[in-house]
Each structure stands twice: as C-alpha cells, then as structure tokens.
C-alpha cells in the first residue's frame, strides 16, 4: 500500500493547501541541497529524493544539488586495497586516492543521481567544480593535537582543498532554465591541480555565492542536538557559537555548523541541517508549517 493510499482524500487536500504559502515563499528562489553519501542509502531512497527534487523544479523553485560520497569512496578504496586515513574529519587524499575520489564522485555517483532525476521527469545536468572553473580551491591544512604530548601539529591532507572562489558563469546558464545542476564536490587550483572538497563546505560556498534562499544539509542525524540528545529546532548564529564553545556541539557537527554560519554571513537566507534518511525530508522542511531538523539563521 502506498503512503498516499493510507491518507484520506480530505487530508491529502489539506496537506496540499498547507504547502501553498510555502511554495509561494520560495517561488523562483534558489535552494541548494547537499545530499550526503550516508543519506543516499538504498536505491529506493535515492529515487525518492530525485522525485522530490523534480517536484521543487516543477513548483518554480530552482534546486541546485551538491552530493557527497564518503561511504562509496571508502568502499571503492577498500576494493582496490587502498587504505583510508583521516585527520580532523577529512580524508587524507594522496595521488592514488584523488584519482579514485574523482572517479567515484564525478563518475558513478554523479551520473547515477542525474539518471534518477531525469527518470523522474527532470532535466539534470551533472557537473563538478572543475567544469567551467566553477570552484577554485587552495590546499587545505588542519592542526591536530598529539595524543601523547598534546602539542598541536600541522597535518598534510594531500589533495584536499578549501574553496577560494566560485564562478557562477556556468551555473547561471542553467538555473532558471528548467535545468537542475547536480554538482560533485571537486575543485581545481589556479595551477590545475584537482582537489577533493568536503561536500558541506562545497555546498556552503556555492550557496553563499548564489545568495540562495535556503541551504539544506542532508546528513545522517536529525539535526543539532542538545546535551540531552534532543533536537534543537532553531538556532541563531550567536546561539550556535555558544553551543560550540560549551561543547554541546562537538565532533563532526562543528564543521557542519561552521559551514552554516559561513553561508549565512555570505547572504544565504537560512540553513537547515536535516536527516536525509527521513522520507521526503526536503519537502517536509520546505512545504510544511513545522519543518524538520535544525534551522540556523542570523
């Protein structure tokens, strides 16, 4: 039995009526959606996400999808006998690894997602940050504390980059023309070196350059949690910084929230961290009164 068949016709009509003002709010606005590798899950989940993206485009919203692929990269590296190493939450990417990363991100994952969107009736265009020099990056570095001496040291992450500049020339040719950009988080240096970029960071940079109405970060957690592990539905930038300082926001959530803050400071209207495994998470956030996840705003 389908989800729709379990809802009465009257309730279906009420749901559509509730969605109308939200559709009007986002009319012809750009929404950047980061679709994480963990959130992709099974094929049926990915296809459902693709249908929801097509629905956004059909309601006069301009969706831009940025996808991750950490689990898929890890699987491919394991198959090839290449060991994965991480520092400060980022994959250390040597010369052998960057070739695999590019193959998985810009090849299999990107084209699969493009195919799902097109099968659902959309017109997706698969790209990465290297295309049209869309995203220029510089080498990223991180400092970590030695567990024995507690002395901080700089870690060489290899071919991992931080976005420096986003050129919107190519994206502006697609957005608003019934085309859905699907972006793999790869960038190039001024000298032509390929860099692997964290998908959250990449999405934040693109959303900031576009001055997007919303940036949605689909992850594998419900949102930002308090110390009792309860969802915090709403945070200002100031609140978020306080929660980082007191340790409530910790671990892998820190860079996600920092990306949210950066995007807001660049002109994004609001950023929401949501659980990508929740069915129709994007529609629940954009088209219902209660929304979902954690909204971070100025």
UniProtKB/Swiss-Prot annotation:
Subcellular localization(s) per the UniProt record: Cytoplasm
UniProt xrefs under InterPro entries: AceGlu_kinase-like_sf, AcgluKinase_fam, ArgB, Asp/Glu/Uridylate_kinase, NAGK-C
GO molecular function, one term: ATP binding
UniProt keyword annotations, A-Z: Amino-acid biosynthesis, Arginine biosynthesis, ATP-binding, Cytoplasm, Kinase, Nucleotide-binding, Transferase
Function description: Catalyzes the ATP-dependent phosphorylation of N-acetyl-L-glutamate.
Catalytic reaction annotation: N-acetyl-L-glutamate + ATP = N-acetyl-L-glutamyl 5-phosphate + ADP
Gene name of the encoded protein: argB
Stated name of the protein: Acetylglutamate kinase
Family of the protein in this entry: Belongs to the acetylglutamate kinase family. ArgB subfamily.
UniProt-annotated site: Transition state stabilizer, residues: 34, 256
Organismal lineage: Bacteria, Pseudomonadati, Pseudomonadota, Alphaproteobacteria, Hyphomicrobiales
Gene Ontology cellular component terms for the protein in this record: cytoplasm
GO biological process: arginine biosynthetic process via ornithine; L-arginine biosynthetic process
UniProt pathway: Amino-acid biosynthesis; L-arginine biosynthesis; N(2)-acetyl-L-ornithine from L-glutamate: step 2/4
Presence of keyword ATP-binding: yes
The protein's enzyme class: transferase
């Amino acid at each position: 039995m389908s989800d729709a068949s379990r809802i009465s016709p009257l309730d279906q009509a009420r749901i559509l009526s509730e969605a109308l003002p939200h559709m009007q709010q986002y009319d012809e606005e750009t929404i950047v959606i980061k679709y994480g590798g963990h959130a992709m899950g099974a094929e049926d989940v990915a296809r459902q996400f693709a249908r929801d993206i097509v629905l956004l485009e059909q309601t006069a919203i301009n969706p831009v999808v940025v996808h991750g692929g950490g689990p898929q990269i890890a699987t491919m590296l394991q198959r090839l006998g290449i060991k994965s190493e991480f520092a400060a939450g980022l994959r250390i990417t040597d010369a052998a690894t960057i070739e695999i990363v590019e193959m998985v991100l810009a090849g299999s994952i990107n084209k699969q997602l493009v195919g799902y969107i097109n099968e659902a009736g959309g017109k997706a265009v698969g790209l990465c940050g290297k295309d049209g020099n869309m995203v220029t990056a510089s080498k990223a570095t991180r400092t970590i504390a030695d567990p024995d001496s507690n002395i901080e040291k700089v870690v060489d992450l290899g071919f991992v980059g931080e976005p420096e500049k986003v050129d919107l020339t190519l994206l502006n040719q697609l957005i608003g023309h019934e085309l859905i950009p699907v972006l793999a988080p790869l960038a190039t240096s001024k000298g032509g070196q390929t860099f692997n970029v964290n998908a959250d960071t990449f999405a934040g940079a693109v959303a900031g350059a576009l001055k997007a109405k919303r940036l949605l970060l689909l992850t594998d957690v419900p949102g930002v949690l308090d110390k009792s592990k309860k969802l915090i539905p709403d945070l200002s930038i100031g609140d978020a910084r306080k929660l980082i300082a007191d340790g409530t926001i910790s671990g892998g959530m820190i860079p996600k929230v920092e990306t949210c803050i950066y995007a807001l400071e660049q002109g994004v209207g609001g950023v929401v961290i949501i659980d990508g495994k929740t069915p129709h998470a994007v529609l629940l956030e954009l088209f219902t009164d209660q929304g979902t996840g954690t909204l971070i705003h100025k």
